[in-house]
Each structure stands twice: as C-alpha cells, then as structure tokens.
C-alpha cells in the first residue's frame, strides 16, 4: 500500500486580500458612526458646562454680595473658589477647548452663558 500525502491547504493571496478589504470596510463604518457619537457627546458636555457655570454664578449673585457686572467680571475667581464646583476654570471651556462666553442679557437682569462652537454645531 502506498502512502498518501496530505496536502496542507494554504490561504491564497486573493483570499487574504478579501479578508483585509472586509476588515477595512467594517472599520470604516464603525469609525464613521463613532464620529457622530463623539460630536453628540461634546454637545452634551458643553451644554452641561454652560448650565453649571450659569448656576454657580447666579448662586454667587443671589448671595447678595456682588452685582451682576461684578459676578461676570470675576467669573474665574468665583468659579475657582466656589464650594459648588471643583476645578471651576475648566468649566469655562467648552468640549472643543474654546472659552465660554459669559455676558449679561439685553435687559441687564440675567447672565447668559454660551459657546460659539455649540451654536455652530446646533445649526449644522
């Protein structure tokens, strides 16, 4: 009886290219979806920062020691020294690293906190 040799089946170059192409397509789809989620996360974080800055500054104003103009002028110091938040200066940045805008409203009776980048993201 003759011995039969078993041949090893190897992967051809074409099969390997097909697998790599499929991996690339799947990775691209995941990366595209991830980008949208990251943008939504930045929008949410910026909205939360704006709300927290507003709340802390209005609490300082409500304490009765400072006028609205003084609160806005001293926002960095007030946020850093506030018992209501940690790392107050970090709150004055949006998720894209740009400074938040803190100003008085048109009537002069309230504070407005906004982000230029957030406005452009919400429009687009």
From Swiss-Prot:
Q: Which InterPro entries match?
A: N_methyl_site, Pilin-like
Q: How does it sit in the membrane?
A: Peripheral membrane protein
Tell me the first and last residues of the signal peptide: 1-31
Pfam (any one): N_methyl
Keywords in alphabetical order: Cell outer membrane, Membrane, Signal
Give the matching Gene3D superfamilies: Glycoprotein, Type 4 Pilin
Primary location group? membrane
Q: Which GO terms describe its cellular component?
A: cell outer membrane
Q: Where in the cell is it found?
A: Cell outer membrane
Identify this protein by name.
Answer: Putative outer membrane protein TC_0858
